[in-house]
């Protein structure tokens, strides 16, 4: 009974400590890129007396919650940005480094996956169509008939044709000579 009470008190105290801790505010800047312009949105709630700084230098005439950077340049406009009010601290910085282009389109992961799957399905479909088309074409083709009798030479007028004249460019194989290529399939040496 004592152990149950001990474990119960321990669990309640751990829960109480976990709920009473001060959670640090997790404020996040919002970045929106459209064409060659980049828009930063300040995470602070107040709209009054907002100031923007870039790399420690205050940006003049930028007191709105949204900071729009037209014709963003990766070299000139990249750096640390912070928005703050005189009453708040400058403790949440945003490091911005972006590449922009005028005619870029952002594609998410699901769109890329769908494009790849559709491409594979179309390719496999075309392969199946070509396979069945060629299979049907072979079945409809006339079989190749050979001449009468054994062998592939046609019989008839060419029956009395003499054997071809040996080519003088090649030397005939001598029977007494045992070279590497002097005969075919002669395994007994």
UniProtKB/Swiss-Prot annotation:
Residues 135-189 are cytoplasmic. It comes from the Eukaryota. Residues 160-187 form the ITAM domain. Keywords: Adaptive immunity, Cell membrane, Disulfide bond, Immunity, Immunoglobulin domain, Membrane, Phosphoprotein, Receptor, Signal, Transmembrane, Transmembrane helix. Its main location: membrane. Residues 157-174 are annotated as: NUMB-binding region. The keyword Membrane applies. Disruption phenotype: Absence of CD3E leads to the complete absence of mature T-cells. Thymocyte development is arrested at the early double-negative (DN) stage. The keyword Transmembrane helix applies. Residues 1-21 form the signal peptide. Disulfide bonds join 42-83. Phosphorylated on Tyr residues after T-cell receptor triggering by LCK in association with CD4/CD8. Residues 23-99 form the Ig-like domain. One of its GO terms (biological process) is negative thymic T cell selection. Part of the TCR-CD3 complex present on T-lymphocyte cell surface that plays an essential role in adaptive immune response. When antigen presenting cells (APCs) activate T-cell receptor (TCR), TCR-mediated signals are transmitted across the cell membrane by the CD3 chains CD3D, CD3E, CD3G and CD3Z. All CD3 chains contain immunoreceptor tyrosine-based activation motifs (ITAMs) in their cytoplasmic domain. Upon TCR engagement, these motifs become phosphorylated by Src family protein tyrosine kinases LCK and FYN, resulting in the activation of downstream signaling pathways. It is a single-pass type I membrane protein. It is found in: Cell membrane. GO terms for molecular function: identical protein binding; SH3 domain binding; transmembrane signaling receptor activity. The modification Phosphotyrosine is found at residues 170, 181. This is T-cell surface glycoprotein CD3 epsilon chain. Residues 161-168 are annotated as: Proline-rich sequence. Residues 143-189 are annotated as: Disordered. The chain crosses the membrane at residues 109-134.
């Amino acid at each position: 009974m004592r152990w149950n009470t001990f474990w119960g008190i321990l669990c309640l105290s751990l829960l109480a400590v976990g709920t009473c801790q001060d959670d640090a505010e997790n404020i996040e800047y919002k970045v929106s890129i459209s064409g060659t312009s980049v828009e930063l949105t300040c995470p602070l709630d107040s709209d009054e007396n907002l100031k923007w700084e870039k790399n420690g230098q205050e940006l003049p005439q930028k007191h709105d919650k949204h900071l729009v950077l037209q014709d963003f340049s990766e070299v000139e406009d990249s750096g640390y940005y912070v928005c703050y009010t005189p009453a708040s601290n400058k403790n949440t910085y945003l490091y911005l480094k972006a590449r922009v282009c005028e005619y870029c389109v952002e594609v998410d992961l699901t769109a890329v996956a769908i494009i790849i799957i559709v491409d594979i399905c179309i390719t496999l479909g075309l392969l199946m169509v070509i396979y069945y088309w060629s299979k049907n074409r072979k079945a409809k083709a006339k079989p190749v008939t050979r001449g009468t009798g054994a062998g592939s030479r046609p019989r008839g007028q060419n029956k009395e044709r003499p054997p071809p004249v040996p080519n003088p460019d090649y030397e005939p194989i001598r029977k007494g000579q045992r070279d590497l290529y002097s005969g075919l399939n002669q395994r007994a040496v």
